[in-house]
From Swiss-Prot:
Positions bound to Zn(2+): C906, C909, C926, C929
Signal peptide residues on this chain, from the entry's feature table: none
Organism expressing this protein natively: Xylella fastidiosa (strain 9a5c)
Annotated SUPFAM superfamilies: Anticodon-binding domain of a subclass of class I aminoacyl-tRNA synthetases, Nucleotidylyl transferase, ValRS/IleRS/LeuRS editing domain
Protein function: Catalyzes the attachment of isoleucine to tRNA(Ile). As IleRS can inadvertently accommodate and process structurally similar amino acids such as valine, to avoid such errors it has two additional distinct tRNA(Ile)-dependent editing activities. One activity is designated as 'pretransfer' editing and involves the hydrolysis of activated Val-AMP. The other activity is designated 'posttransfer' editing and involves deacylation of mischarged Val-tRNA(Ile).
Gene: ileS
Entries under Gene3D superfamilies matching the protein: 1.10.730.20, HUPs, Valyl/Leucyl/Isoleucyl-tRNA synthetase, editing domain
Name of this chain's protein: Isoleucine--tRNA ligase
Length: 943
């Protein structure tokens, strides 16, 4: 080439870096956000808009954040930011859960239990200081994720005002009649020395002893008569039970049978040379006898369970204790014997049976529950068969009790069972049911259960199965144990009568008075309070209780202590947490909301799955498969983590591995490269001067704006239904297919070769400006750092941050009367695909090197040919090929053929044209390039 025409081309130019370099670039953006008080500015721009309130469920203030925290906070952040673009004011007030056992354990490890080196006041202060330190660490990590919120004024459950509002919330619940006191079996952790909530329990496999124990009948003939059988004089009669908790047998006070189950009187194994008949559920008889070494099922009679009611048995090792046969609807024929040993101090269903029969007051507290808070039998526990139980831990007692049963001849079978068993979420140790005096929010009193079930149906659940799940949980849950026997928490400020144990009749009003003091001085004031201040002359008749509130009550009343306190409306628009929160925060918030206001505190509930590795295994240190968010940020950047979260179906388990992160990085690169190409071609474009009206745009440019409009509608709808994976896929497809494989490829010719201010070039730049202005908004909720950076390179005057705007309004659909309609483009793009398929084998066989070397002939039916012939001169730009000819033919649809060109190649645009050499000044250029270099410039209408 004798002349260098490169300087006549308008190649892309931008300072927007090709490499994201996110680990270095993101902290600088964060610094600017901090310096500019970005959250305050965001709220100021949104002032006066409709409110969208996503209420933050508080993470626990203990330990560094993990991947699950990152998933949760980033999903919330994506929603908050998308709502701002959607025209809402979407405040975000982060919070922390600060009371409870994990912090107590951390302080105990350092200083010992309360009373060792610290008194209770000092201990609570150390807990408070520890929680504050943990909040600082977690806040730093959350902000590094790009989470925008009121980080300078978060809510903390340890704040005096919050603690006071929590007591006021409890007072409301007392006013509504939902609080009761009772001695009931509750989940108990010996290591905690306290009751546990349902949400503080996790199920882990455990090996337990499995025993069948015979309870002899005191009047065997009468019991046999129930089965229309006559008991021979030398035959014993017993009812076997099956249990995996032999340690509860000292508390066994009855046997429950199913009233409608069928029972049979069968021949059992001999005992001391004597025959023994057994009563078993018919459906379980053969299986039970097999455990006892009996192969033959010999039935002496049958009866319904109801017929055995109130017959009396003997305790297997306490001869002076009589055991009544009671009816229990919880008894099933699924396993065991069909008879359930009933210890009302160690089982909720057992307790309910005794309550129904009015038997609870017939026994002392030690008889109902002979086990202390540490898991040791009380000194009053009776011994048997040389076995002294008093002072023995129940787990050590299990094998000793089995041996003693064997010696007494009442052990029918013994084995071990590997099964799922409840454990303390913090200590990872087995827990038990243990009857203790506790305070409960009653599910039945004041009809809380039915009101909660109704409220659930007025909430929108994402995914939809969440509704059925929480309905089932509420239908079956027991009363909520809200009292804890610990130190670090909000006290239950009740005065109870010294003799009757009844709460003071003015309890709610007294609570509010205590709350006023707590707001000024903190929870310690309750313990130092002189009760004569509040009770006057009644003070001697009452005593303060020292229990604290369940931490799930703390977080469960945030709708009251945070939203109302900050002037925000209830119910919140959205609660968003992990799937385990159906039994945690969603449920505690629901119950307090219904108890106080007779309504759920949220309109929508969204749950996300847990993070697992590529094999579906839970991430853990022991497996060595954990990936920490801090490591991802350090090596790849927060936007890569955000993109992975957004692109994953969070309704199920969320898989992450290094390979998945690599694919996510590739996807990010595609998005960034697309943005960079768009910006590069906007070099020298000023929208205030050069923007082409939509009606004057080249047809292809107008069509891509139409496509962007369609995609924006799809993206907005997906953000509304929280389907972020669809958004990411839509954007990636747009980058690859609509832009990369089509629009950007086709328009390079116009952008590079036309005169700088040519209408055809300005039309393409206008389209790219519209695309970029929309594109940056589409990605902003997800790729917040990259969108911030991209926004700073967008030409023209605009707001300081993309999130100060709303969805881009410069897009519009093609009008029905457009010269080329959307339907026309669908057909043309189908034609383009056919052309590509025809050229592929020619390129593969070396017939042509590039599509520009091929001349295309399209034979089409008359109507199609007539429609396409006006486009003939420009179809070559759409196909990026040589000349195109359209001819009518007697055919349905169209037929594409191609042949190599014989024309010369233009040194500037690389097209093969017949007029090369016709211009003496530019003999190496085609006529189009000559007019673009030295003339008025070419005219383009379609492509």
């Amino acid at each position: 080439m004798s002349q260098d025409y490169k300087t006549t081309l308008h190649l892309p130019a931008t300072d927007f870096p090709m490499r994201g370099d996110l680990p270095k670039r993101e902290p600088a953006i964060l610094e600017r956000w901090e310096r500019d008080d970005f959250y305050a500015q965001l709220r100021a721009h949104a002032k006066g808009r409709p409110l969208f309130l996503l209420h933050d469920g508080p993470p626990y203030a203990n330990g560094q954040i993990h991947l699950g925290h990152a998933v949760n906070k980033i999903l919330k952040d994506i929603i908050i930011k998308s709502k701002h673009l959607d025209g809402f004011d979407a405040p975000y007030i982060p919070g922390w859960d600060c009371h409870g056992l994990p912090i107590e354990i951390a302080i105990e490890k350092k200083y010992g239990k309360v009373g060792v080196t610290l008194d209770a006041v000092q201990f609570r202060q150390k807990c408070r200081e520890y929680a504050a330190e943990q909040i600082q660490l977690q806040r730093r990590d959350f902000k590094r994720l790009g989470i925008i919120g009121d980080w300078d004024a978060p809510y903390k459950t340890l704040d005096f005002r919050f603690e006071a509002d929590e007591i006021r919330a409890l007072a409301k619940i007392v006013d509504k009649g939902h609080l009761i006191r009772g001695t009931k079996p509750v989940h108990w952790c010996f290591d905690c020395g306290s009751a546990l909530a349902e949400a503080e329990i996790e199920y882990t496999d455990k090996t337990s002893p499995m025993v069948d124990v015979a309870y002899p009948a005191l009047d065997p003939s009468a019991l046999a008569a129930v089965f229309n059988a006559t008991l021979p004089p030398d035959v014993q009669l017993a009812v076997p039970i099956w249990t995996t908790t032999p340690w509860t047998l000292p508390a066994s006070l009855a046997i429950s049978v199913g009233p409608t189950l069928d029972y049979v009187l069968v021949e059992g194994p001999t005992h001391s040379g004597q025959r023994r008949w057994l009563i078993l559920a018919e459906a379980l008889a053969a299986k039970a006898l097999a455990r006892y070494g009996i192969a033959e099922l010999l039935i002496h009679g049958s009866a319904k369970g109801a017929a055995m009611e109130q017959h009396i048995l003997a305790h297997p090792f306490y001869p002076d204790r009589t055991i009544p046969l009671l009816l229990g609807n919880h008894v099933s024929a699924e396993d065991g014997t069909g008879a359930v040993h009933t210890a009302p101090g160690h089982g909720q269903e057992d307790h309910q049976v005794f309550q129904q029969y009015g038997l609870l007051n017939h026994y002392s507290a030690a008889e109902l529950n002979p086990v202390d808070a540490r898991g040791v039998y009380l000194p009053t526990t009776p011994p048997f068969s040389e076995l002294t139980l008093a002072g023995l831990h129940i787990w050590k007692a299990n094998p000793l009790i089995v041996d003693a049963l064997r010696l007494r001849g009442v052990l029918l079978a013994a084995a071990e069972m590997h099964h799922s068993y409840p454990h303390c979420w913090r200590h990872k140790t087995p827990i038990v049911f243990r009857a203790t005096p506790q305070w409960f929010i009653s599910m039945e009193q004041a009809a809380l259960r039915s009101a909660a079930l109704k409220a659930i149906t007025h909430v929108t659940w994402y995914p939809q199965w969440g509704q059925a799940r929480i309905l089932s949980m509420i239908e079956n849950r027991p009363d909520w144990t809200i009292s804890r026997q610990r130190t670090w928490g909000v006290p239950i400020p009740l005065f109870v009568h010294r003799h009757s144990g009844a709460p003071h009749p003015r309890s709610a009003a007294l609570m509010r008075q205590v709350a006023d003091r707590v707001e000024q001085q903190g929870v310690d004031i309750w313990y130092s309070l002189d009760q004569t201040e509040l009770l006057g002359t009644e003070a001697d008749q009452y005593e303060k209780i020292t229990d604290i509130l369940d931490v799930w009550f703390d977080s469960g009343i945030t709708h009251e202590a945070v939203l109302l306190e900050r002037g925000l409306p209830k119910p919140a628009d959205l609660y968003l947490e992990g799937a385990d929160q159906h039994r945690g925060w969603f449920q505690s918030s629901l119950l307090t909301g219904v108890a106080m206001d007779n309504a759920a505190p949220y309109k929508q509930c969204l749950t996300h799955g847990f993070t697992v590795d590529q094999h579906g295994r839970k991430m853990s240190k022991s497996l060595g498969n954990g990936i920490e968010p801090q490591d991802i940020i350090k090596t790849l950047g927060a936007d890569i983590l955000r993109l992975w979260i957004a692109s994953t179906d969070y309704s199920n388990e969320m898989s992450l591995s290094q390979e998945i992160l690599k694919r996510t990085t590739d996807a990010y690169r595609r998005i960034r490269n697309t943005a960079r190409f768009l910006l590069g071609n906007l070099h020298g474009f000023d929208p205030t001067l050069h923007l082409v009206p939509l009606s004057d745009m080249i047809a292809l440019d107008r069509w891509i704006v139409h496509r962007a409009f369609e995609l924006q509608q799809t993206i907005k709808a997906a953000y509304t239904r929280y389907d972020f994976a669809e958004i990411v896929q839509t954007i990636l497809n747009f980058c690859s297919v609509d832009l990369g494989s089509l629009y950007l490829d086709v328009t390079k010719d116009r952008l590079y070769t036309m005169r700088e201010d040519a209408p055809g070039r300005r039309s393409a730049q206008t389209a790219m400006y519209h695309l970029t202005a929309a594109f940056v908004r589409w990605i902003a909720p997800i790729l917040s750092f990259t969108a911030d950076e991209l926004w700073s390179y967008l030409p023209g005057d605009h707001a300081d941050n993309v999130l100060f705007t709303t969805w881009y309004d410069g897009l519009a659909p093609l009008p029905p009367n457009a010269p080329l309609t959307a339907a026309d483009f669908d057909k043309l793009l189908t034609l383009r695909d056919h052309v590509t398929k025809v050229l592929e084998p020619m390129r593969a066989n070396g017939v042509i090197g590039a599509a520009l070397e091929a001349e295309i002939t399209i034979a089409a039916d008359a109507d199609t040919a007539a429609r396409w012939q006006p486009l003939t001169e420009e179809l070559r730009f759409l196909f990026i090929s040589g000349d195109v000819t359209v001819t009518p033919a007697n055919t349905d649809g169209f037929f594409v053929s191609a042949q190599p060109t014989t024309k010369a190649k233009c040194a500037r645009c690389w097209h093969y044209r017949a007029d090369i050499g016709a211009h003496p000044t530019h003999p190496e250029l085609c006529g189009r390039c000559v007019t673009n270099v030295d003339g008025p410039g070419e005219q383009r209408h379609w492509f």
